[in-house]
Amino acid sequence: MGDLMTRALLSKMSAFLVLTFMSLPLRAGEAPKVVVTIKPIHSLVARLMAGIGQPQLIVDGSASPHTFTLKPSTARAINEADVFIRVSDTLEPFTRKIVSSLPSAVTVVTLIDAQGVKLFDQRHGGTFEKHVHGHEEANAEGHAEEAEDHDEDGKDGHIWLDPVNAKAIVAASAKAIAKRYPEYAEKLRQNEAAIDADLDALDREIATELKPVRDKPFIVF
C-alpha cells in the first residue's frame, strides 16, 4: 500500500509539471534565450516565462540525461544562450565539459546548489536495503542507472519532486533571468507568485493524503 500511495503522490507532481507546460502564451518579438536541460525543469521554467518567451529544451523525447550526447546544434544553442539551467553535472554528465568552456556572457544556473533546495540522502539500509538485495539480479541494470541519479555525496538528484524544491528552482531561475533582463522582472515576479501558490496547494494536498501513513516505511522504485 505504501508503494502505491507514493507512486500516486509522485504522479501528482509529474501531472503538475505537465499541466504547467501546456497552453503557455508567448510574448511577441525577441525573448530571452533560456536553455534548459531536462523536461521537469523545462516545464517549470516555461510557466515562469509565460508571456515573455519559451525556453529551449535540450534532452527531448525519450533520451536519458545520463547517456545524452550533445549535437552541434544543441551545443551551439547552449553557447548562444543568455541563461543555461541544469540540475547538476552528475545528473547531466554531458554538461560538464561545455559548462567549463562557455562564454562569460552565458549565465549558468546549477539548481542543486540553488538557495532553498533541500537535498535528500540516497535511500539505503533497513527496509530499502532488504528490498534491493532481494532483487539484485533482476534489477542490476536499473539500479546501476539509478546510481547515476545521485551526486557524489550520496544525495538524490531528483530535486524537482519535492514541491518546496520546485519553488526554489523557480526562484533561482527567475533571479537569473531577471538579472539579465530587468525589464521582465515584474512579469517574472507575477508568474513566480502564481506558481508558488499552486505548489503550496499541491504540497498541502500531498501532506493530507500522506498523513495516514506518515509513520510507516515504504519504498519508491
Regions found by a protein language model. Give the residues of each.
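Extracytoplasmic metal-acquisition and chelation regions
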Residues: 12, 27-221
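Low-complexity intrinsically disordered segments
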Residues: 2-3, 17, 141
